Amino acid sequence: MVTLGHVTAQQMSFSDALPLRSGAALRDYTLVYETYGTLNADRSNAVLVCHALNASHHVAGTYADSDRSEGWWDNLIGPGKPLDTNRFFVIGVNNPGSCFGSTGPTHPNPATGRPYGADFPVVTVEDWVDAQARLLDGLGIERLAAVIGGSLGGMQALSWTLRHPARVGHALIIASAPNLSAQNIAFNEVARRAIITDPDFHAGHFYAHGVVPKRGLRVARMIGHITYLSDDSMEAKFGRALRSAELAYSTQEIEFQIESYLRYQGDKFSEYFDANTYLLITRALDYFDPAREFGGNLSAALAVARAKFLVVSFTTDWRFSPLRSREIVKALLDNRRDVSYAEIAAPHGHDAFLLDDPRYHGVLRAYFERVAQELPR
């Protein structure tokens, strides 16, 4: 299948302060983004891709300096792929507070000239959506043909239909939920605590000390990675396989292949991800709850939505189970909204939304065909 080839990141800077849900404001900020495909004459074929916790604006294609830098959803987006860049103008944007180029904790605080660190304001899903809307304003795009996201990205897609209902034609919400369960909040808290209690964290101002709280980041990633996989997929990939033929009878050495894998994932993550960003994004996950202002009534919260919806879940995803997706579907049906639902039998757990499953991609391809057919001709 034809690929996008080399792509280039772009930037857009904003001097007008972005009001945040916390009551604070983000001033003089920059958003990094990428686009794929061509915006049509009436600017009606734009699709926004919202990223999850440790992803970025680099959704598809590769960079010229590294053919190994494939975008995180490259199997989905490109010429002839389910989200076909021959038909759609696709936008990926890095959210404020992240660590992949948009203004975040590693950037200078205009008030001090030093990195924000822990002083970066707390951001929410709603704040990200408002920042994305400003980016679209700058690109001259009044309305999206569709917005799509998986996991935390799905929460952003849902939020788009509530905060800017007139600007969204279709919303594709994949492997997501209307809010986090207590168990998910607990996982996030344990991961944050691992980072905060790392001696190299220095209350979030570790940049000035020339260190990185890698121990905490490693543990946080190991915890998170376990939740992204299903028991079946871990058993199939690792089982009880040992690293060597004989047991070492040690409490500290690596004995099992799954231990080695988790440590590898933790080591890799700690080399590129920012600790303060991890705290910010997991807290944004915790805070997302559109029904909160409606006494917990999700149907009432979604009444303002005008988009058409596709909701997708995966049978072995225990972090955001199919039950959570069905909550969204029911609330939309309560409001007589146009919603399609697909529950994909897949063994891969939460990470299934990132993989090239033929049934899953078949559903997305068919739905984007519908979106394309509704574009002005």
Swiss-Prot record:
It holds the Pfam family Abhydrolase_1. Its EC number is 2.3.1.46. Keywords: Acyltransferase, Amino-acid biosynthesis, Cytoplasm, Methionine biosynthesis, Transferase. Residues 45-356 form the AB hydrolase-1 domain. One of its GO terms (cellular component) is cytoplasm. Coiled coil: none annotated. It comes from the Bacteria. Gene3D superfamilies: 1.10.1740.110, alpha/beta hydrolase (3.40.50.1820). It catalyses: L-homoserine + succinyl-CoA = O-succinyl-L-homoserine + CoA. InterPro entries: AB_hydrolase_1, AB_hydrolase_fold, HAT_MetX-like. It is an enzyme of class 2 (transferase). The active site is at S151 (nucleophile), D317, H350. GO terms for molecular function: homoserine O-acetyltransferase activity; homoserine O-succinyltransferase activity. The keyword Lipid biosynthesis does not apply. The record marks R319 as: Important for acyl-CoA specificity. One of its GO terms (biological process) is methionine biosynthetic process. Pathway: Amino-acid biosynthesis; L-methionine biosynthesis via de novo pathway; O-succinyl-L-homoserine from L-homoserine: step 1/1. Transmembrane segments: none annotated. Substrate binds at R221, D351. HAMAP family: MetX_acyltransf. Transfers a succinyl group from succinyl-CoA to L-homoserine, forming succinyl-L-homoserine. Homodimer. Belongs to the AB hydrolase superfamily. MetX family. PANTHER family: HOMOSERINE O-ACETYLTRANSFERASE (PTHR32268:SF11). This is Homoserine O-succinyltransferase. The gene is metXS.
